Curated annotation (Swiss-Prot):
Record keywords, A-Z: Methyltransferase, S-adenosyl-L-methionine, Transferase, tRNA processing
Protein known as: tRNA (guanine-N(7)-)-methyltransferase
Origin species: Buchnera aphidicola subsp. Baizongia pistaciae (strain Bp)
Keyword tRNA processing in record: yes
PANTHER family: 3-DEOXY-D-MANNO-OCTULOSONIC-ACID TRANSFERASE/TRNA GUANINE-N 7 - -METHYLTRANSFERASE (PTHR23417), PENTACOTRIPEPTIDE-REPEAT REGION OF PRORP DOMAIN-CONTAINING PROTEIN (PTHR23417:SF14)
Length: 242
């Protein structure tokens, strides 16, 4: 299992500009042991080969991905409510991994797996085309300063890759409290053939009742921040990319 990110796998050149800054600190012995034990049970190692979800989850249920799950609130809530769906969470921060693993263990959820690695590389190298029913990216770092925009995780390249990973009719859900970021995402999506914006007004949708309002989101709402919810449907024919 990986405790620290490794950027060169099998001599492959990994991307240089990343959407995160490592804040992982030294762990206590107990936390290191917990992480080791439960990543073995609930984690998937990074590799440059596609994951067989039917084998990993021992069923053929739909797979839902959350990129950057934070404390794991949303991921766990969805997994508990949807036992006939499988959930994959990708995260790079150890505190987030620890929090989510505790939830998975507490509720004994067989339908959740986590990957401790860079989401862009996981999606590119580990997830086969036409294998995801839904993708969530909730409150990604907006990197508000112009000189940092290149660090944003949501790029045209990522959205094009996600489109190939989604099944026909699959959904991409994004939420942010940064209007500039939201508009940027809309502009990017407009230039990608294969997505339909499900907003009646061509921009944002109302938050679905089944999407848990996380602690992070609640704090923003208390401060008066507006939340921008985006939802897109894949109409891309993946048959040529299987």
């Amino acid at each position: 299992m990986y405790f620290y990110l490794k950027y060169n796998i099998n001599n492959m050149i990994m991307r240089r500009v990343r959407s995160f800054v490592s804040r992982n600190r030294k762990l206590t012995q107990n936390k290191r042991q917990f992480l080791k034990n439960y990543l073995l049970k609930y984690g998937i190692d990074f590799s440059c080969s596609y994951v067989n979800f039917n084998f990993i989850f021992n069923n053929e249920y739909p797979v839902i991905l959350e990129i950057g799950f934070g404390t794991g609130e949303f991921l766990i809530n969805m997994a508990r409510k949807n036992l006939f769906s499988n959930f994959l969470g990708i995260e790079v921060y150890i505190p987030s991994i620890l929090s989510c693993l505790r939830y998975i263990h507490k509720y004994n959820l067989p339908n959740v797996k986590v990957i401790f690695y860079d989401a862009v590389e996981v999606i590119s190298y580990m997830i086969s085309n036409n294998s995801l029913s839904e993708v969530y990216i909730l409150f990604p770092d907006p990197w508000p300063k112009r000189r940092h925009h290149k660090r944003r995780i949501i790029t045209k390249e990522l959205l094009e890759v996600i489109l190939k990973k989604l099944v026909f009719g699959g959904y991409l859900n994004i939420a942010t409290d940064c209007q500039i970021y939201a508009k940027s995402i809309l502009n990017i999506i407009e230039n990608i053939k294969g997505y339909i914006n499900l907003s009646n007004t061509g921009d944002y949708v109302i938050r679905s009742d089944y999407r848990l309002v996380t602690k992070f989101e609640k704090k923003g709402l208390v401060l008066g921040n507006k939340i921008f919810n985006l939802k897109f449907k894949s109409i891309f024919n993946n048959s040529n990319f299987l």
